[in-house]
Each structure stands twice: as C-alpha cells, then as structure tokens.
Amino acid sequence: MILDLSYLRYPLPSDITMLFESGRFEEMERLIELNLSKPELPAALKKHLEFLRYCAEDIREAYQLTSEQAFDNARKRIPDLTRDEFHHLRDDRTLDWRYIDGKRYYRNNCINNLLRTRRPYALREKGTSILLEEENEAAERDHLIHTLKEKGRIRYQGTMQESISVCSDRLTPGETLRFWLPLPVRDFPLVSSRLCQTSHPPVQISPENAPQRTAYFEVPYEKNVTVAATLTWETEMVYRKPDPALATGELPAGDVTEQDLAQVEPHIVFAPYLKALTREIVGDTDNPIVKARRIYDFITTQGTYRFMPSYRSIPDIVGYFCANLHGDCGVQALTFITMCRCCGVPARWQSGLYTSPASFGMHDWAMFYAAPYGWLHADCSFGGSAYRNGAKERHDFYFGNLDPWRLPFASRFQYEFTPPTRFMRADPYDNQVGEAESLTRRLFEDELDKSHNLLSGTLCD
C-alpha cells in the first residue's frame, strides 16, 4: 500500500516553521518537545512535528561546509576561481547552501555538482577528471544507442552483490535487527531475476510484482554483522520512436490503473502553480505524446541537474523543482510524472540501479502511457545532460527509451515494504540500498554501511 505521509502537507506552527527555515534546530527541537507534551495536540500535527526532526538531522548532515571551506574546496579543484565568481555561483543557485544557527553552510558535494553541471568550470578543473569521466560515459551511451537503433533490441545480463553492515556501541549483542534488501521488481525492461545467495536465510521475500520488492531478514546483532545478497538479472530494451500522429488517447483498463493518474500526497499534488505551469507548457493539445514531449523538453532544457539532500528534508519535491528549476534524477522524474498526470497522461515511477561498466549506482526515471505504444520510458536527467552537451540524438532517445543498463527495484513512489518497518525509513519514498532497524528504534546512518557492487555485466543479442 501507499505509505501515508499526507500529514506533511498540514501546516506547522509559525514559530517552528521560522526556526526550521532559519536552521535554528536546537530552538526548534525545544518547541517541538513543548508542543508534543500537550495532550490536546492533534495527531496529524504530532506526526508532522516528529517528522521535522528527521528533516533537521538530514540537513545538518548534508550542509557542513562553511563559506570559507566551500571556497577553499572550490579553489583546490579550480585554482583560478575568484571569490566574485564563487559569490555569483552562490547567487544564481549553482552552489547549494542553507542557514544553520545563523551561519551560511554549503552542501557537502556542491563543488562536485558545479563541475558536473557547468562545463566551462569543468574545463578549468585541475586534472579535468570529472570532464573525462563524463565524456567516457557519454561515448559509451552513444555507442549503445546506435547499436540499439540498428538492432532494434538488446539484452543485458548482470550479477551484483548488495549488503548492509551494522556496527554500533548503542546496540546490545544478541538483540534482533531487521533488514530489508532491495530485489528486482518484475517491470519492463526486466525479463527475469534470481536471488542466488544470501548471508542469512530470509524471513520473507516479496512477490515479484511488489511495487518496492525486498528480501526481509531478522538477525541477532554482533559487531560488524553483515546481511548480504547476490542477484542475477536480465533486461531487454526494445527501441521505439513514438509518433504523435499514431497516438489514440485510449487508456485500456488492463494497462492503466487509477493510481497512474492519481495524486499522492505530499509530493505528487496538483497544486495551483503546478497546474498553471503545466497548462503553460502543454498548451491546448489533446495528444498524449505531444503533452509528454513538451513536459520532457521543459524539464530537460529549462531545468538543470543538482545533487540533492535526503528527500525527507524536502517538504514539496515537485514544487521545489518548479520554483528553482533544478534537481536530481528523482526530482526531475517526479516532476515529469506529476505534470503528466495533471494533464491526463498516465505516468509512474521507476527506480533502481544504473549498471553500465563505466558507472554503477542509484538512479531514478519515469514512465508514461501512450496508445498504441503502451508504457514508454522518459529519463529526464540523462536527457538534460545530453541537451546541455549538444547531443540531440541522445536527448531524443531518452524520450520513449532507456539504455538496457537498468535494474528496477521500484515501480511505485512512496510504497510500504512487506513486512512494513516499525520506524521511519531513511528513505520513505524509494528503496535502492536497503533499510535496517532494531525492534525498539531506527538505526542511524553512522551505525550502517550500505554497499552494492557490480560483479559482472554482459550485453547480448
């Protein structure tokens, strides 16, 4: 079922809101405690106040660089960067920052973000490592796109290992820990998958069609206890070039559900600005492919990529993108989905791992429905990268298609696990690296070491 986080849309007391926005988290915590002690406090408000604590933790963890530290880090990578340039990058929202306790703190990876999204600065980087890395990845994608277009379909077979290790002096040896490791979900482009080996016997394995599929374990704690799994999978990508002239607008009941057009609070919401912006982008067309393409073009040409803090710390993910015109792969995918649904085009979430030889890691993308083609993919962040680098063919490709280097772990956003967690997840919206908790509390990030490693990957006809 959908994880109910609708209470995050409810208003907070004005003093607590001001303290949160200004980063005065100790004062905020004191007022939260005061409010929670009131027996007349509405239950919905209580949940929102408790969630705000997680937001504060995430922000403190993500924004730790003072202005001088951020500038020094930038100068190490770009030796000729001036302070005026640094301030301009701050003011045009390239460098992400927040006020915490009255001081400006920058996002820990803001310089990496600058070098990955602003090519003129990447060209000035000492060693140009990021630029070379991106050029290699782009060449790899372009070669595969040409091959897929030529052959019409490509299969990919992969093997990976994932694990969660726990080490903490706040846990008692022998107490039960609960683990959820992500498993591939049966959704296009996945053809098959197999759980080959686990470090411990799983208590429960979700069905293949579970929206966020997991292997669930219960293991007694000991120092550095590790729960691990080895997976194999096969995907098949078929090249499709959606033609608006062939679109019918039909929504077959077997292919499309109410969920594919629904709002899901707190983020997939047809807020007034979202509706106005979508109308402006889409215009008066009734063609679902044209609608989706106009939304894709808006996000990929007007928006830019930015590394994001934990989604728990963002009150309105889609509203954030619409106001700031930047965000990471998940923010862009969720914005695409919400805009599509807002104008009557069915759309849904997909996420998991990108598993190419040059790059292996977490990634999010979207799907939209257009008869007679059925469900099609849209990868706004990869499309935006292609647009920024003048790669029109690759930009067009990621509207309607994916490369086969995808391992989907989730087919829905904000879905509960089976069995559900007892405490707030580190990521209540998605599941790409797994979750862990004890029977009495959630586990903190400094108690956990999560990893995933690609063991092998082969493209095949």
Predicted regions and their residues:
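Mature N-terminal, pre-catalytic/accessory segment of carbohydrate-active enzymes
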Residues: 1-44
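Active-site nucleophilic cysteine motif
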Residues: 288-295, 325-340
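Hydrophobic/aromatic-rich core segments of domains that either
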Residues: 6, 10-14, 18, 22, ...
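Low-complexity, Gly/Ser/Thr/Pro-rich intrinsically disordered linker/tail segments
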Residues: 400-461
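Short intrinsically disordered coil segments
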Residues: 195-198, 243-253, 380-383
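Acidic low-complexity segments
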Residues: 13, 20-23, 27, 207-211, ...
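Intrinsically disordered, low-complexity N-terminal segments that are enriched in acidic
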Residues: 29, 34-239
